[in-house]
């Protein structure tokens, strides 16, 4: 079903394929807990490329390859010759000769496309300016750990053009869930991608709505999610975005409008006092640390299925 394919965006996959990735993610978690991890990548080499700094993604991907019996080869920005002018396609061609898979955290999504087309091996999106599919899988895994397979309602509060939000929208649409996005009218997803997601949502019965009022978006939801207001590479518009989003902080008062057993989620890193108050992210409703841990298991699942 997956062997030899790449994972650049969840929109490229059918609902049953996403469900399979989640199913194997839960299996991987149990394998790790009981020290029975299969050697799915025995003898396999996986290149992990990082144009952007990384903590959770670096740890989860390198550890995933190692636990599955593979050999991780980590290259940071200063190690990549394309930062000195080499064609991305040339890097892809060379890596494709010596590794069995490539994971890449990149500034531009087109870099992933070029690696996929030139390398001939599975390529995995470890975060781009467009999306973060492994994060979305970990998000849904975390939600299901708390609420089972029930049709939960989710609210995202913050930047409506956020790459993490786009992957969340994609998986919500594919699985027929309900998502309410609280964001200023100036910050919306790309029209072309929102059109695709809306068409999928119509087919699956998913509900995705945008609100300017965060209290309206959060009312009655099971999950309240946020991300940083200023992503890496947006430093030149940082103050502008902070002004636009100053009324979109997740506070304890805002959480009261969700259901009683609602959880708070954040993909990290977090800026306490900016997009979320400390009492929320460090409080009893926070599922952030489970969410971060689950990044390992979804990565293990995807690598074992695709490589």
UniProtKB/Swiss-Prot annotation:
Carbamoyl phosphate binds at residues 54-58, 81, 105, 132-135, 266-269, 295. One of its GO terms (cellular component) is cytoplasm. The record marks 29, 145 as: Important for structural integrity. GO terms for molecular function: amino acid binding; ornithine carbamoyltransferase activity. Pfam families: OTCace (PF00185), OTCace_N (PF02729). SUPFAM superfamilies: Aspartate/ornithine carbamoyltransferase. One of its GO terms (biological process) is arginine biosynthetic process via ornithine. It is found in: Cytoplasm. Disulfide bonds: none annotated. L-ornithine binds at residues 163, 227, 231-232. It catalyses: carbamoyl phosphate + L-ornithine = L-citrulline + phosphate + H(+). It comes from the Archaea. The keyword Transferase applies. Keywords: Amino-acid biosynthesis, Arginine biosynthesis, Cytoplasm, Transferase. Pathway: Amino-acid biosynthesis; L-arginine biosynthesis; L-arginine from L-ornithine and carbamoyl phosphate: step 1/3. Its main location: cytoplasm. Its EC number is 2.1.3.3. The keyword Isomerase does not apply. Reversibly catalyzes the transfer of the carbamoyl group from carbamoyl phosphate (CP) to the N(epsilon) atom of ornithine (ORN) to produce L-citrulline. Belongs to the aspartate/ornithine carbamoyltransferase superfamily. OTCase family. This is Ornithine carbamoyltransferase. The lineage of its organism: Archaea, Thermoproteota, Thermoprotei, Sulfolobales, Sulfolobaceae.
């Amino acid at each position: 079903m997956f062997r030899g394919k790449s994972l650049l965006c969840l929109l490229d996959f059918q609902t049953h394929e996403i469900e399979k990735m989640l199913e194997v993610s839960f299996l991987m978690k149990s394998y790790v807990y009981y020290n029975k991890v299969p050697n799915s990548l025995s003898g396999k080499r996986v290149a992990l490329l990082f144009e952007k700094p990384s903590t959770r993604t670096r740890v989860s991907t390198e550890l995933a390859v190692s636990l599955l019996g593979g050999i991780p080869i980590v290259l940071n920005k200063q190690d990549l010759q394309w930062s000195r002018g080499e064609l991305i396609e040339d890097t892809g061609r060379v890596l494709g000769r010596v590794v069995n898979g490539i994971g890449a955290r990149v500034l531009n999504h087109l870099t992933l496309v070029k690696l996929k087309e030139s390398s001939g091996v599975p390529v995995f999106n470890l975060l781009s300016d467009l999306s973060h599919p492994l994060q979305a899988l970990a998000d849904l895994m975390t939600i299901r750990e708390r609420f089972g397979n029930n049709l939960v309602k989710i609210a995202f509060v913050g930047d409506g053009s956020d790459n993490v939000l786009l992957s969340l929208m994609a998986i919500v649409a594919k699985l027929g869930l309900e998502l309410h996005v609280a964001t200023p009218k100036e910050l919306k997803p790309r029209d072309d991608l929102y059109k695709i997601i809306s068409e999928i949502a119509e087919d699956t019965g998913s509900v995705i709505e945008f609100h300017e009022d965060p209290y309206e978006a959060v009312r009655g939801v099971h999950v309240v999610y946020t991300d940083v207001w200023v992503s890496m590479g947006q430093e030149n518009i940082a103050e502008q975005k902070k002004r636009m989003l100053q009324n979109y902080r997740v506070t304890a008062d805002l959480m009261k409008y969700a259901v009683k057993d609602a959880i708070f989620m954040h993909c990290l890193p977090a800026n306490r006092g900016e997009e979320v108050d400390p009492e929320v992210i460090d409080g009893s409703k926070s599922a952030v640390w489970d969410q971060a841990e689950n990044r390992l298991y979804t990565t293990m699942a995807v690598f074992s299925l695709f490589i």
